């Protein structure tokens, strides 16, 4: 969430850095990863999926049993969204816009529980990579992080450690 991102910048003692990216601080990424892991252990400790406690309590807890295998018929091999993505990225290519595209993973444990197995998810990741590559778009691929601890906030949004990886890669672009 924006609040989490704002807090990340605010609480690291980097308030004086320009948000324009002109001056990128030299973060100790390993130290930040350790710090957010400690925070995540406190904020995602009421479930087996390392989902944020508040999110889990609000959206999952009461219907947990009903959600088992609830998405088992989900398929990612044919979707209108792929065509939309291809159109967008082809426009980016035609306009000679230099960009990178991030593939964000699903929460592997949670997806498995709801019936979307790894092979099914891999279809989506591969299709997205293919579309990006066909349009000469460089990909920052995090799909192999599905089972990394505290990587995701919920089922589909980057969490504590995921943001550290993403931020580190963004800073590499600027440096």
Residue ranges: model-predicted function:
Residues 84, 92, 99-102, 167, ...:
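Functionally constrained cores in energy, signaling, and assembly domains
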Residues 111-175:
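Long, positively charged, glycine-interspersed low-complexity recognition regions
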Residues 1-91:
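Secreted/periplasmic serine-hydrolase-like ester/acetyl group-modifying domain
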Residues 91-116:
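Active-site segments of SGNH/GDSL-like serine hydrolases
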Residues 63-68, 103-106, 129:
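Generic detector of short, locally flexible boundary/turn motifs and exposed helical patches
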Residues 70-72, 80-81, 100, 109-110, ...:
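Long, well-ordered mid-to-C-terminal structural blocks that present hydrophobic/aromatic surfaces
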Residues 86-100, 130-138:
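A structural motif corresponding to the C-terminal end of an alpha-helix
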């Amino acid at each position: 969430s924006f609040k989490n991102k704002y807090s990340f910048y605010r609480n690291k003692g980097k308030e004086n850095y320009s948000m324009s990216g002109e001056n990128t601080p030299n973060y100790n990424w390993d130290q930040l990863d350790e710090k957010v892991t400690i925070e995540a252990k406190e904020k995602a400790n009421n479930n087996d999926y390392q989902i944020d406690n508040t999110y889990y309590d609000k959206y999952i807890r009461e219907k947990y049993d009903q959600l088992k295998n609830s998405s088992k018929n989900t398929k990612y091999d044919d979707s209108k969204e792929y065509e939309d993505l291809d159109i967008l990225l082809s426009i980016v290519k035609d306009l000679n816009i230099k960009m990178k595209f991030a593939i964000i993973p699903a929460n592997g444990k949670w997806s498995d529980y709801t019936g979307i197995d790894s092979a099914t998810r891999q279809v989506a990741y591969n299709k997205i990579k293919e579309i990006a590559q066909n349009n000469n778009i460089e990909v920052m691929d995090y799909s192999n992080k599905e089972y990394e601890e505290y990587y995701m906030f919920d089922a589909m949004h980057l969490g504590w450690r995921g943001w550290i990886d993403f931020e580190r890669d963004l800073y590499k672009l600027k440096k």
